[in-house]
Amino acid sequence: MPKMKTRKAVASKFRVTATGKLKASRPGRRHKLTGKTPKRKRQLRRPGLVDDGHLKTYKRLMCL
């Protein structure tokens, strides 16, 4: 059986934490920032964790 290939699009968007969870930047901070409050933009800076429903799928795509 051949080796599985990593999906580079997924691998570039997520980082693996020490506990095996996936960390990603939050959506909504690319454009149209004038309509968002400073508090909202500040909260979007922090990376978010992937929820458990998608975790298994993304890990499989990253060959983890």
Curated annotation (Swiss-Prot):
What keywords appear on the UniProt entry? Answer: Ribonucleoprotein, Ribosomal protein
One GO molecular-function annotation for this sequence? structural constituent of ribosome
**GO BP annotation list:** translation
Q: Name one Pfam family in it.
A: Ribosomal_L35p
**Transmembrane parts of this sequence:** none
> Which InterPro entries is this protein grouped with?
Ribosomal_bL35 (IPR001706), Ribosomal_bL35-like (IPR021137), Ribosomal_bL35_sf (IPR037229)
Q: Which GO terms describe its cellular component?
A: cytosolic large ribosomal subunit
Ranges for the region named Disordered are 19-44
Name the residue ranges with Basic residues bias: 23-44
Q: Does the keyword Ribonucleoprotein apply?
A: yes
Q: Does the keyword Ribonucleoprotein apply?
A: yes
* SUPFAM superfamilies assigned to the protein according to its UniProt record, in alphabetical order: L35p-like
Q: Which family does it belong to?
A: Belongs to the bacterial ribosomal protein bL35 family.
Q: Which NCBIfam families match?
A: rpmI_bact (TIGR00001)
Protein name from the UniProt record: Large ribosomal subunit protein bL35
Species name: Protochlamydia amoebophila (strain UWE25)
- Whichever gene encodes this chain, its name is rpmI
